[in-house]
A protein has these predicted regions:
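Active-site cofactor/substrate anionic-group-binding motifs, chiefly glycine-
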Residues: 1-24
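General beta-strand structural signal in soluble alpha/beta enzymes
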Residues: 5-7, 28, 34-39, 60-64, ...
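A glycine-rich phosphate/pyrophosphate-binding beta-strand-loop-alpha-helix module
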Residues: 17, 21, 25-65, 71
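Glycine-rich phosphate/pyrophosphate-binding loops
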Residues: 57-69, 174-193
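Phosphate/diphosphate-binding glycine-rich loops and adjacent basic-rich segments that engage nucleotide
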Residues: 70-145
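Secondary-shell segments that build the walls of catalytic and ion/ligand-binding clefts
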Residues: 119-186
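Catalytic-core signal marking the mid-to-C-terminal active-site face
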Residues: 176-179, 186-279
Length: 279
């Protein structure tokens, strides 16, 4: 029910779908499949790979051990990656449950978006160079690796009092399963950009009737959606629902792009002599 793949220092977005295909085939035969990948690079959106299992009426999981950029709780040195985890489960009439989140206080890309949009980071997202959480809005840090950034991401939770030990523990879990278990080390070791990946597929039919599972998922999702919202909020949503609704809207109205992204595409197309079209 297991396999291990050498990523050949290539993009994880290429090899991870293949790894999930292998995990799915193993799950069809024995109920569960787990595949690890070492010596790889960025795998893109973790939930993309987890959702491949959903397409086969299975529960999918994907996690990736990333290069360091996040402080451990009580730490002043970034020794852990953002280490995202994605889990996806099918439903019947409702959209799939899809959880996909970095185990840092905020995803690394949010820092780049803040720089691009000229906005500040919220309190508890980053710490200064001595590891003290910055509990006020602050400009996004200057990019850098191995100690050269101007500030560092905190674990999910921000401070120990607000539960950063939980985010810290989850990052460690990903380093173990998506790093050490792959045989390829972890973010800090071997000292170069190093990604390890872990994918798993759970065949629902090996545990219970698939139709009953999906029916109960609908019931559970409806329970969440129908629960009472807090003041200032219209409704309660479940993980994956906002993204599902965004796909529907953008399929009709198009995808909004920041002008810097458009300029980047123009420049790259010009360098490579590729026609540029924007519709």
């Amino acid at each position: 029910a297991t396999a291990n793949i050498d990523g050949d220092r290539g993009l994880g977005i290429i090899v991870t779908p293949k790894a999930m295909d292998i995990a799915i085939e193993k799950a069809k035969n024995v109920g569960m499949g787990v595949v690890t990948i070492h010596n790889s690079r960025h795998l893109g959106m973790a939930s993309y790979h987890a959702l491949k299992a959903v397409d086969n009426d299975m529960i999918g999981m994907c996690m990736t051990s990333c290069p360091p950029g996040v402080l451990p709780t009580f730490g002043a040195e970034p020794v852990l990656g953002t280490n995202p985890i994605a889990i996806a489960a099918p439903a019947d009439k409702e959209a799939p449950f899809v959880f996909d989140a970095a185990m840092s206080a905020v995803a690394g890309n949010k820092l780049g978006l803040a720089r691009r949009n000229g906005t500040q980071l919220l309190a508890g997202w980053v710490a200064d160079h001595d590891g003290s959480p910055i509990m006020e809005e602050v400009d996004p840090p200057t990019p850098g690796y191995e100690g050269s950034a101007s500030s560092y991401l905190l674990p999910l939770g921000g401070t120990r009092e607000l539960g950063s030990h939980k985010g810290y523990g989850m990052m460690c879990l990903v380093d173990i399963l998506g790093g050490i278990l792959t045989g390829g080390g972890y973010g800090m070791n071997p000292g170069r950009p190093n990604f390890g990946h872990y994918v798993a597929a759970y065949n629902i039919e090996a545990f219970m009737d698939t139709k009953e599972f999906k029916r109960t998922m609908d019931e559970w999702i409806n329970m969440l959606n129908s629960s009472k919202p807090a003041p200032g909020h219209d409704r309660v949503m479940y993980p994956g629902q906002p993204e599902h609704e965004a796909v529907i809207e953008r399929s009709k109205k198009g995808i909004p792009l920041h002008y810097e992204v458009i300029d980047w595409f123009k420049d790259i197309c010009g360098e490579l002599s590729i026609p540029f079209f924007l519709v």
